[in-house]
């Protein structure tokens, strides 16, 4: 099915959050490193919602509304400080971070504000110890170019990253403070994007600009992309956490499909005069002898119940696919899971199945007075959870009669999305008065403009000229995740051909990944040590592959240890000569018989023994010399 | 053009629209944009401004709660001196509005409903750093009034900077048969992470106890787990910003309070109330008392300055066990010869002054300097003000190192440090 995106009125906006690679955090002087070792300690905090939101007069509602949530924060004495623990006022913002953010703004043709204010954005999910995120609006009204047209950049903000969630311990959520405060730029586009491909291209372009500064962090989790997607008659959906460029295109495609299908279902429901019955039926008795493992486990729980709701006119539609592999029933299930914490639900479009018999389904339908065209949803769990789950289902089913509900959704690996939470209202923000306004002088802007970093197209030309890369390799390298590393390695190891470095980073790594090696374990240091060894003659270029495989298997080992493990211990020129002399002696009769024509045969024998330990060219030179001497 | 108006500003960087906000810099126009962010525009860059809509006067009133009195609960009066235990944020302008009625307090901290009947009143609006003896007197008078009107306990909401001075002053000036609890917050009450709520709950829990005396309640540790009840004359703010900034000095806290379970665990004996609801105040304070920190190379002339200004008392914050350099001895003698009461404390804060150990101390005693035992300098300052306000100098010299309200403990606990 080919979708005409213009016809369906597709509008996409991107929101990109990129971590900056600064020496210190945005509002304190701690380093911007993440740790996986044991924290030095933990503290407990309770965050209470702000007073301004409440109009409750009822006593119980007031107490409930003001009840705080409990969080545990892990800290390190040497890399987190009192600021992250919300025990000390923030320090002045990192000037380095501010400069990088302004570079990005200028590269995207934006207008920088005269005076920037640090704001507090209320966040009480615990991801910030203070209960708010500090954020600074710096620029607006920019644009980038894509092959399908201009994309407006409506805002660029400099803000602090949130704390890392570690686990949910039941009565408290645990966060680690190492990530809290790492500077982020938040870039928002206008909803100018009209196709999935354009969305991917815009994201790629923004990524290129960010990397051009040379000051953004690399690695999983350092860039996060949220996508706002809407179609005519549909709704604005915010999809969070898209990490991969290719996934952007897929997510947009699948979201359009989902919304179109929800609209079709709505039309069908209306035609049937469908109705959601707002009553929860206790059908525990019907299922007390049920063979379903899920139901049996639920009934063993304290206050375990099976309950049902009746959706008149929904038959055949609950099981209808709205995204590849996901159905309307999955949407109901998502809501129930998120809101009530149940494991899932059953619906009559998929029954009898899962140990639930036709007889039980029949009794169920009779009990709730379901007709041919009706669907029934059942949930089994502890009673209070079941009730909340079915209330959520009722709510979502009513939304199905209207069309597409506005939601925040989570991106899945296959390009589908799942419900996360309602779309947030306007962020509640007020000034961070602990930090003075930032006056951004024209001279400062002009100084940055005069020193803007190189853009990809400029880099492309330079790579061809300076590093003698061909068009294809230069293009690949400019867009490569490893582009900065490439230049570092070329500068450090001038006796290594840039082409070799480029093909290793963009070719060899992909090959060994295909062979099953986990290249995510490779760090810059591994590649640096590899090329250093090559530069110093410790390994031949044929040995690079084995060394990198070794580092994948043993990331903590040193280069010498890897060479030992892989049997690639370096051979000196003298050693190579001896080995070659040995091989010649061993095959003296062949030499005598064939004369110089023995070269090919002997080269094969030499390389069989020396592969990876010595450069092929070196072996070739020595062998030819030895043959001439005879 | 007024704050709150919706304006459109034309600049060389495009058009900005938003709500006009107050600006601390007269060269900057500050507006709140639709996206919630504030932005500043230099006036020199403005081409044109027009008002799109007049702003509404913001209202900060919420419907009354109509709380009924619970006869089973004690009545606690919460008096504010200017600290904001509760506050409302106006997200439009960013202003934080202090609120201090019983309804406001209960709305902010509804847990109070289950603990006590609450009366709330602001008795002054003074930043803690602007506190002075005349305000201490007013607080004491207000306390007396509340108790006479039936309060079973008093909570004083106070800025943390000088809370320990006020706690000391009230300890000496007020003799009441109900607990008087000073409480504050290290994080402003507008933010979700504020310590104000737990501190206030704990203070009210302490205020309903059948005890008497003046105390301070603040966070016991960085985490939101428990609060300490500190004796008002044995507590000091020891950190500029941490939640657990307040420490008992040369003593351990009186009690540990769990605001979640409402449990109070006493760590030492306290004076019990006899239910008489008696209250007497003595607000006589001699204000001409100075606190001088001793340091190497100091010019003792500062002492003559105070003496010539007719100061009646001087607290020296000496080094070590209570020492001062010999080159200021002549100035100290000038003071004591003139009848000024000169007393010694230590800048180590912790530990007891003892001027018998070294010759320096012995010489100081010959000059008439009196050691203050284990009182922190701030407490000694306030005590000297109180004594000089009520007694002749000779009597003051006898009383300064005698315990009156718990300010001196004659046993030095190992675990107090």
Curated annotation (Swiss-Prot), chain A:
Top-level taxon of origin: Archaea
Keywords: ATP-binding, Ligase, Nucleotide-binding, Protein biosynthesis
Gene Ontology terms describing biological process: glutaminyl-tRNAGln biosynthesis via transamidation; translation
InterPro entries the UniProt entry points to: Asn/Gln-tRNA_amidoTrfase_suB/E, Asn/Gln-tRNA_Trfase_suB/E_cat, Asn/Gln_amidotransferase, Asn/Gln_tRNA_amidoTrase-B-like, GAD-like_sf, GAD_dom, GatB_C_1, GatB_Yqey_C_2
Enzyme's top EC category: ligase
Catalytic activity: L-glutamyl-tRNA(Gln) + L-glutamine + ATP + H2O = L-glutaminyl-tRNA(Gln) + L-glutamate + ADP + phosphate + H(+)
EC number(s) from the headed UniProt entry: 6.3.5.-
Alphabetized GO MF terms: aminoacyl-tRNA ligase activity; ATP binding; glutaminyl-tRNA synthase (glutamine-hydrolyzing) activity
CC terms in the record's Gene Ontology section: cytoplasm
Annotated coiled-coil segments of the chain: none
Family named by the database record: Belongs to the GatB/GatE family. GatE subfamily.
Role, per record: Allows the formation of correctly charged Gln-tRNA(Gln) through the transamidation of misacylated Glu-tRNA(Gln) in organisms which lack glutaminyl-tRNA synthetase. The reaction takes place in the presence of glutamine and ATP through an activated gamma-phospho-Glu-tRNA(Gln). The GatDE system is specific for glutamate and does not act on aspartate.
Subunit structure, interactors included: Heterodimer of GatD and GatE.
The protein, known as: Glutamyl-tRNA(Gln) amidotransferase subunit E
Organism: Methanocaldococcus jannaschii (strain ATCC 43067 / DSM 2661 / JAL-1 / JCM 10045 / NBRC 100440)
Curated annotation (Swiss-Prot), chain B:
Reported function: Allows the formation of correctly charged Gln-tRNA(Gln) through the transamidation of misacylated Glu-tRNA(Gln) in organisms which lack glutaminyl-tRNA synthetase. The reaction takes place in the presence of glutamine and ATP through an activated gamma-phospho-Glu-tRNA(Gln). The GatDE system is specific for glutamate and does not act on aspartate.
Keywords for this protein: ATP-binding, Ligase, Nucleotide-binding, Protein biosynthesis
Cross-referenced InterPro entries: AsnA_fam, Asp/glu_Ase-like_sf, Asparaginase/glutaminase-like, Asparaginase/glutaminase_AS1, Asparaginase/glutaminase_AS2, Asparaginase_C, GatD, GatD_N
UniProt catalytic activity: L-glutamyl-tRNA(Gln) + L-glutamine + ATP + H2O = L-glutaminyl-tRNA(Gln) + L-glutamate + ADP + phosphate + H(+)
Molecular function GO terms recorded: asparaginase activity; ATP binding; glutaminyl-tRNA synthase (glutamine-hydrolyzing) activity
SMART domains named in the record: Asparaginase
Annotated active site: 84, 160, 161, 237
Listed HAMAP family: GatD
PANTHER family: 60 KDA LYSOPHOSPHOLIPASE, L-ASPARAGINASE
One GO biological process term: amino acid metabolic process
Record's protein name: Glutamyl-tRNA(Gln) amidotransferase subunit D
Domain Asparaginase/glutaminase: 74-403
Subunit structure: Heterodimer of GatD and GatE.
EC number: 6.3.5.-
Homology family: Belongs to the asparaginase 1 family. GatD subfamily.
Highest classification ranks of the organism: Archaea, Methanobacteriati, Methanobacteriota, Methanomada group, Methanococci
Short name of any one Pfam family annotated for the protein: GatD_N
């Amino acid at each position: 099915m080919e979708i005409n995106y213009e016809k369906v009125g597709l509008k996409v906006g991107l929101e990109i959050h990129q971590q900056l690679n600064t020496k210190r955090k945005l509002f304190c002087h701690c380093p911007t490193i993440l740790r996986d070792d044991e924290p030095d300690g933990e503290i407990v905090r309770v965050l209470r919602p702000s007073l301004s939101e409440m109009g409750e007069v009822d006593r119980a509602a007031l107490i409930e509304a003001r009840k705080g949530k409990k969080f545990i924060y892990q800290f390190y004495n040497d890399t987190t400080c009192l600021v992250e623990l919300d025990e000390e006022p923030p320090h002045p913002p990192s000037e380095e971070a501010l400069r990088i953010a302004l570079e990005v703004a200028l590269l995207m043709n934006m207008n920088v504000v005269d005076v920037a204010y640090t704001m507090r954005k209320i966040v009480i999910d615990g991801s910030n110890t203070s209960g708010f995120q500090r954020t600074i609006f710096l620029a607006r009204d920019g644009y980038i170019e894509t092959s399908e047209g201009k994309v407006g950049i409506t805002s660029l903000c400099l803000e602090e990253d949130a704390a890392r969630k570690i686990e949910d311990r039941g009565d408290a959520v645990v966060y680690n403070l190492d990530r809290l405060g790492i500077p982020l730029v938040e870039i928002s586009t206008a909803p100018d994007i009209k196709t999935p491909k354009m969305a991917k291209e815009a994201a790629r372009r923004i990524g290129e600009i960010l990397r051009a500064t040379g000051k953004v962090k690399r690695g999983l989790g350092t860039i996060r992309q949220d996508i706002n997607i809407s179609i005519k008659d549909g709704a604005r959906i915010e999809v969070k956490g898209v990490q991969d460029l290719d996934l952007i295109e897929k997510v947009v495609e699948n979201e359009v499909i989902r919304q179109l299908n929800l609209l079709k279902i709505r039309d069908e429901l209306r035609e049937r005069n469908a109705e959601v019955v707002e009553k929860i039926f206790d059908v525990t008795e019907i299922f007390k002898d049920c063979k379903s493992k899920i139901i049996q486990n639920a009934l063993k729980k304290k206050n375990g119940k099976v309950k049902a709701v009746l959706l008149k006119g929904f038959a055949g539609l609950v099981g209808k696919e709205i995204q590849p592999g996901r159905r309307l029933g999955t949407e109901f299930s998502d809501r129930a899971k998120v809101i009530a914490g149940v494991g899932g639900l059953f619906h009559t479009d998929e029954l009898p199945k899962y140990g639930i018999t036709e007889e039980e389904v029949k009794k169920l339908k009779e009990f709730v007075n379901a007709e041919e065209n009706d669907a029934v949803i059942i949930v089994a769990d502890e009673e209070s959870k079941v009730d909340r789950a079915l209330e959520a289902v009722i709510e979502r089913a009513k939304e199905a009669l209207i069309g597409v509900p506005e939601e925040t959704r989570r991106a899945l690996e296959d390009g589908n999305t799942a419900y996360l939470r309602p779309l947030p209202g306007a962020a509640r923000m007020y000034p961070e008065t602990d930090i003075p306004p930032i006056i951004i002088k024209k001279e400062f802007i002009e100084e940055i403009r005069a020193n803007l970093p190189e853009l990809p197209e400029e880099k492309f030309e330079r790579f061809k000229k300076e590093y003698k890369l061909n068009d294809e390799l230069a293009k690949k390298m400019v867009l490569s995740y490893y582009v900065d590393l490439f230049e570092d390695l070329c500068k450090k190891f001038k006796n290594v051909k840039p082409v070799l470095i480029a093909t290793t980073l963009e070719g060899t790594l992909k090959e060994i990944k295909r062979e099953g090696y986990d290249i995510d374990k490779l760090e810059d240091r591994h590649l640096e040590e590899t090329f250093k060894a090559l530069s110093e003659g410790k390994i031949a270029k044929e040995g690079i592959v084995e060394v990198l495989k070794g580092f994948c298997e043993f990331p903590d080992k040193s280069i010498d240890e890897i060479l030992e493990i892989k049997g690639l211990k370096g051979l000196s020129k003298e050693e190579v000569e001896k080995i070659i002399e040995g091989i010649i002696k061993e095959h003296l009769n062949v030499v005598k018989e064939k004369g110089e024509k023995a070269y090919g045969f002997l080269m094969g024998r030499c390389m069989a023994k020396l592969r990876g330990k010595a450069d092929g060219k070196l072996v070739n030179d020595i062998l030819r010399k030895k043959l001439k001497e005879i | 053009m007024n704050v709150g108006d919706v304006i459109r500003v034309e600049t060389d960087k495009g058009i900005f629209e938003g709500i006009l906000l107050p600006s601390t810099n007269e060269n900057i126009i500050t507006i709140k944009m639709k996206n919630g962010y504030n932005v500043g525009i230099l006036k020199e860059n403005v081409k044109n401004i027009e008002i799109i809509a007049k702003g509404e006067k913001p209202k900060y009133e919420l419907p009354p709660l109509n709380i009924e009195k619970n006869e089973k609960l004690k009545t606690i009066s919460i008096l504010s001196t200017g600290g904001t235990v509760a506050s409302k944020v106006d997200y439009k302008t960013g202003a934080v509005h202090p609120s201090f009625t019983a309804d406001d307090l209960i709305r902010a901290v509804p847990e109070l409903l289950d603990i006590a009947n609450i009366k709330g009143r602001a008795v002054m609006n003074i930043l803690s750093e602007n506190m002075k003896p005349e305000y201490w007197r007013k607080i004491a008078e207000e306390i007396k009034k509340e108790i006479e009107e039936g309060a079973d306990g008093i909570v004083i909401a106070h800025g943390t900077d000088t809370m320990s001075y006020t706690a000391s002053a009230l300890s000496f000036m007020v003799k009441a048969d109900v607990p008087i609890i000073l409480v504050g917050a290290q994080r402003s009450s507008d933010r979700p992470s504020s310590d104000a709520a737990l501190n206030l709950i704990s203070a009210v829990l302490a205020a309903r106890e059948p005890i008497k005396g003046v105390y301070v309640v603040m966070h016991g540790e960085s985490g939101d787990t428990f609060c300490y009840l500190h004796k008002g004359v044995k507590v000091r703010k020891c950190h500029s910003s941490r939640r657990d900034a307040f420490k008992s000095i040369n003593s351990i806290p009186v009690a540990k309070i769990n605001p979640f379970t409402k449990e109070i665990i006493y760590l030492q004996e306290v004076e019990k109330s006899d239910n008489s609801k008696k209250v007497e105040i003595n607000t006589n304070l001699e204000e001409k008392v100075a606190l001088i920190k001793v340091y190497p190379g100091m010019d003792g002339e500062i002492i003559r300055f105070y003496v010539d200004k007719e100061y009646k008392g001087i607290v020296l914050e000496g080094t070590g066990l209570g020492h001062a350099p010999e080159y200021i001895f002549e100035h100290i003698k000038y003071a004591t010869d003139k009848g000024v009461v000169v007393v010694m404390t230590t800048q180590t804060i912790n530990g007891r002054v003892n001027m018998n150990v070294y010759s320096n101390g012995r010489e100081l005693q010959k000059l008439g300097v009196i050691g203050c035992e284990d009182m922190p300098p701030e407490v000694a300052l306030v005590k000297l003000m109180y004594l000089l306000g009520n007694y002749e100098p000779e009597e003051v010299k006898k009383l300064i190192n005698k315990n009156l309200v718990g300010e001196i403990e004659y046993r030095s606990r190992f675990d107090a440090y």
